[in-house]
Amino acid sequence: MSVPKLRFKAFDGDWSETLFQDLFIFKNGVNASKEQYGSGIKFINVLDIINNPNGITYDSIIGSVNITSKEIDKNLVKYGDVLFQRSSETREEVGQSNVYLGKDPVVFGGFVIRGSAQKEYDPIFMNGLLKTDSLRDQITQLSGGSTRFNIGQDSLSKVSAYLPLKEEQTKIASFLSAADEKISQLTQKHELLSQYKQGMMQKLFSQQLRFKADDGSEFGEWEDKKLGEVGENIIGLTYSPTDVTNDGTGILVLRSSNIKEGRLDKSDQVRVNKKIQDKIIVQPNDILICTRNGSQRLIGKSVIINDDEVMTFGAFMSVYRSKYNRFIAYLMQTPWFFEQVQMNLGARINQITTGTLNEFTFDFPCLEEQTKIANFLSAIDQKIEVVAQQIEQAKQWKKGLLQQMFV
């Protein structure tokens, strides 16, 4: 029966199945020389499709291209047009789509397919429909390729979708817009808290803002110290492909991909069956640091470990171990830390050695003031984490609704 599991009470009757060939007119986008990019009319590329899940607005479009008025007319994108990603390295991502919600004229790039409406629909409803599992499954199954996966106009024409009347589409669209607004508000709150934290860190570590002792007295002067004087840098585990397990057994080896936005993320796992020295078993309050990577921007990113699982860390990582780590973990998020990282990167390889890390020099307050600073910043982090969880819950709630409000 072609009706959704969740439905507004004012509506009944079956949704009608419609082929994309009857819903859209498809066209591939602009192919221009590299000299033509960077000026002219705005054009939608693959990144615009991926980075704007709630719809592409005029202001969100990054690129521009200098083409003739004739080319503009042929490749114009209008309000409500759907844009599809033509190719991807993975089948799961091919054919990702988005709707243009801007009123100003734009064009679209050669790695994109435009679907111009042949029948009237609500663009926000259509954007939600295209992100449901059933539509995504149809599109990915129709893609082809081996090293790269592609979807063409003919394949997209074979996709079918169930649509209600326009009035019900608009009702669903309004509901989805309200959910998106809630997520947007939470995201803005998260950004403001993060900015507040950065501002307070700037003031605290520059000593522009100082705490006082519990008795109201002033703390003493901060002292220059090297990281090697107050703690120890430890080199990670070297292992071979034959040590890696594929059945979930063995010890987890932490790598750079396990540090995401200052948090430990264990979703990307490599586990090994190998005898591990006690020294390179991660301890509570250890700081995990990326010390070697093909991407220079990842060097120096770190996270403090507060996890009960027995874990080790890879050879491209380092662990810093100190009784002052609650303070030092925040110190390693400051511009002063990353300035020293950039100054000491290897000439040929993107790396900082443990010996180099030991020479990094910073101003340190007494332990009592360190504790007050760490407690203050930790309280902000807890608020940021609560909002991050609320954002994720709201996204999952919306995703669940998408699967039930569409056929």
Q: How should each PLM-predicted stretch be described?
A:
Residues 169-172, 179, 366-394:
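Extended amphipathic alpha-helical segments enriched in small hydrophobics
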Residues 2-4, 31, 105-111, 143-167, ...:
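A short glycine-rich beta-alpha junction/loop motif
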Residues 45-46, 62-131, 255-256, 275-335, ...:
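A short beta-sheet element
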Residues 1-12, 178, 183-223, 386-407:
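Short amphipathic coiled-coil heptad-repeat segments
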Residues 21-33, 48-82, 228-242, 257-286, ...:
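Sequence-specific dsDNA recognition surfaces
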Residues 3-30, 158, 166, 213-237, ...:
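Non-catalytic DNA-recognition/assembly elements of restriction-modification systems
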